[in-house]
Amino acid sequence: MVTTGREKLKPFRYPVIVKPNAEGTSKGITSASVVKDETAARAAAKQLVDRYHQPALIEEYITGREFTVGLLGERRPKVLPPMEVVFVDPPTHPVYGYEEKQTDTPRVRFECPAQLTPSELRRIEKVVRDTFAALACRDVARVDLRMTKDGRVYVIEINPLPGLTPDFSDLCVIAKVAGMDYRSLI
């Protein structure tokens, strides 16, 4: 967590992604959020701190496929089908940022359900359930993940209050694919 841009940083394996600590919908995240050295990380963090008046997070950038997964319920939540965010003609380090989430951009498309092997699906379901439980989520959440080429799954964000705009918000789209109408989801 960076509050000034002058803090001593832990050693990172670059590239890293720099993002606001407490924004939603990837506000403050663009392709420029992925940086390749400490100087650029400090500059990006300072810019976010100044713009959003909150700490910035610096995390190792995870290369791989990106998914979002909805969960519904309590102790053993129902895991909805994973939706893959597929980057069209991606740059070296693609990000699913604010602009991509707010517009009908040709830079991303969605596959729901995602094309996964049974073992990949089980791994993702375990990670999202464990994350839901570890954070004591209730009723609903959406977990964003990256899966590396060797099948390791990393949580990049959890949203315990996901958007619910019909036919637009990820959770609503995923629920519809799972055969759930909007009224049942709500």
Functional labels for PLM-detected ranges:
Residues 38-126, 147-154:
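Phosphate-binding site of ATP-dependent enzymes
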Residues 13-15, 66-68, 142, 155:
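Broad gene-expression machinery/nucleic-acid interaction feature
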Residues 1-57, 63-65, 76:
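Active-site nucleotide/adenylate-binding loops and adjacent lid/helix of ATP-dependent enzymes
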Residues 21-23, 101-103, 161-164:
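Short connector loops/turns at beta-strand edges and beta->alpha or beta->beta junctions
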Residues 115-186:
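ATP-dependent carboxylate activation and anion-phosphoryl transfer catalytic cores
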Residues 20, 73, 84, 159-162:
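Short beta-strand elements
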Residues 25-28, 107-110, 166-169:
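Short small-residue beta-strand/loop micro-motif enriched in glycine and branched aliphatics
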